[in-house]
C-alpha cells in the first residue's frame, strides 16, 4: 500500500514539474537539467529512506539507468549509498561511496562536486561513528562541513553541525560540542527550521550541560 502511495506521489510530482518545465522553456527563460530532475526525485524519495530503503534502492537504480549527466548520476549513486546504509549493507555502501569519490577526485571543481564530497564525507563520518572511530568521525564531519560551505546546497549545514557536535561530545570535548550545537541552532534560525525539528540540538546541549555539571561536582 505504501509503495502505491509513493508511486502516485512521484507521478504527481512529475506532472507538476513537467508543466512547470514546459511553461518556463516556452518563454525561453529556463531549460530543465538532469540535476533539476535529481532534486525533484530527491524531494520525492527522501522521506522513504528510513522507512523503506529497499524501495529507495530499486527506484534510485532505475533513475541512474536513465541519467545522462555524470554529475547527476553520481548524486544518485550517493543517494543509493545512503539507502544501503539504512539496509545495513555496509560493503555496498562503501563501494558506492568509493566510486563517487573517485569521480569527484577526477572532476572539474564546482559547487555541485563540493556537494557530492560533502555527502560522501558526512556518510563516512557516520560509518566511523558506528564503528567507534570517534577521532576519524570528527575528521570526516569537518571535511563534510567545509565542502558543504563551498557547495550549492547549504540546507544541510545544520545536520552536519549536529553530527560534528555529537562527535566532539563522544571524544569528551564538551566545549567544542557545545560550540557546534550552537552553530547548528544558528543555521536552524537562518534556514527557518521548525522548532519540532530542532530537538536533537536541544537534547545535545542539555546532555553537554549535564555532563559538564557532573564533572564539576566530582572535582
Feature-to-residue mapping (PLM):
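Structural signature of alpha-solenoid helical repeat scaffolds
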Residues: 68, 108, 112, 152, ...
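TPR-repeat structural position
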Residues: 51-53, 90, 134, 174
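Conserved small/polar residues in nucleotide/adenosyl-binding loops
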Residues: 215-219
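Amphipathic alpha-helical segments of tetratricopeptide repeats
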Residues: 61-65, 98-109, 143-147, 182-190
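N-terminal leader/linker segments that initiate helical-solenoid repeat arrays
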Residues: 24-75
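Single-residue signature of alpha-solenoid repeat helices
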Residues: 54-56, 93, 137, 177
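Conserved alpha-helical positions within TPR/SEL1-like repeat arrays
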Residues: 78-86, 115-130, 156-170, 197-207
Amino acid at each position: 500500500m505504501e509503495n502505491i502511495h509513493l508511486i502516485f506521489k512521484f507521478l504527481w510530482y512529475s506532472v507538476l514539474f513537467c508543466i512547470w518545465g514546459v511553461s518556463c522553456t516556452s518563454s525561453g527563460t529556463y531549460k530543465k537539467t538532469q540535476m533539476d530532475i535529481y532534486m525533484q526525485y530527491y524531494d520525492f524519495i527522501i522521506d522513504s529512506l528510513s522507512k523503506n530503503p529497499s524501495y529507495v534502492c530499486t527506484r534510485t537504480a532505475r533513475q541512474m539507468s536513465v541519467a545522462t549527466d555524470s554529475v547527476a548520476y553520481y548524486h544518485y549513486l550517493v543517494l543509493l549509498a545512503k539507502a544501503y546504509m539504512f539496509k545495513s549493507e555496509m560493503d555496498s555502501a562503501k563501494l558506492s561511496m568509493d566510486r563517487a569519490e573517485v569521480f569527484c577526485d577526477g572532476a572539474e571543481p564546482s559547487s555541485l562536486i563540493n556537494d557530492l564530497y560533502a555527502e560522501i564525507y558526512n556518510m563516512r563520518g557516520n560509518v566511523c561513528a558506528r564503528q567507534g572511530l570517534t577521532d576519524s568521525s570528527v575528521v570526516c564531519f569537518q571535511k563534510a562541513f567545509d565542502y558543504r560551505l563551498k557547495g550549492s546546497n547549504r540546507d544541510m549545514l545544520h545536520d552536519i553541525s549536529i553530527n560534528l557536535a555529537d562527535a566532539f561530545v563522544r571524544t569528551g570535548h564538551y566545549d567544542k560540542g557545545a560550540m557546534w550545537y550552537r552553530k547548528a541552532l544558528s543555521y536552524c534560525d537562518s534556514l527557518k527550521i521548525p522548532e519540532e525539528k530542532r530537538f536533537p540540538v536541544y537534547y545535545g546541549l542539555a546532555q553537554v550541560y549535564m555532563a559538564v555539571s557532573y564533572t564539576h561536582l566530582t572535582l
